[in-house]
UniProtKB/Swiss-Prot annotation:
Gene Ontology CC annotations of this record: extracellular region
Compartments where found: Secreted
Keywords (A to Z) from UniProt: Bromination, Disulfide bond, Hydroxylation, Ion channel impairing toxin, Neurotoxin, Secreted, Signal, Toxin
Comment, domains: The cysteine framework is XII (C-C-C-C-CC-C-C).
Organism, scientific name: Californiconus californicus
Principal location: secreted
Propeptide residues, chain positions: 20-42
Pfam families: Conotoxin
Post-translational modification 4-hydroxyproline, affected residues: P77
Tissue specificity note: Expressed by the venom duct.
Protein name: Mu-conotoxin-like Cal 12.2b
Highest taxon, organism lineage: Eukaryota
Residues annotated as signal peptide: 1-19
Length: 84
């Protein structure tokens, strides 16, 4: 039970981790954190031609999953381990 709670908390918090260290100002737009870059480097995430890939990709550049760019939680649909 404790492990399940920890995993749920991690899944809820991880997409927002860069909010703690990155300010949302016009001069400093949201970018990918190092762990997000490493996910992209390993090929887990991809957004070819700006299309949404159902694999839990963290949005770095618009468009991604939503016509205006990242969706409200800054994450594409799916899970990080879903490689479809």
């Amino acid at each position: 039970m404790k492990l399940t709670c920890v995993l749920v908390v991690l899944l809820l918090v991880l997409p927002f981790g860069d909010l703690i260290t990155t300010s949302n100002t016009e001069d400093n737009k949201r970018g990918a954190t190092p762990w997000q870059n490493s996910l992209k480097a390993r090929g887990v995430c991809s957004t070819p031609e700006g299309s949404c890939v159902h694999n839990g990709c963290i949005c770095q550049n618009a468009p991604c999953c939503h016509p205006s760019g990242c969706n409200w939680v800054n994450v594409c649909p799916g899970f990080l381990w879903d490689k479809n």
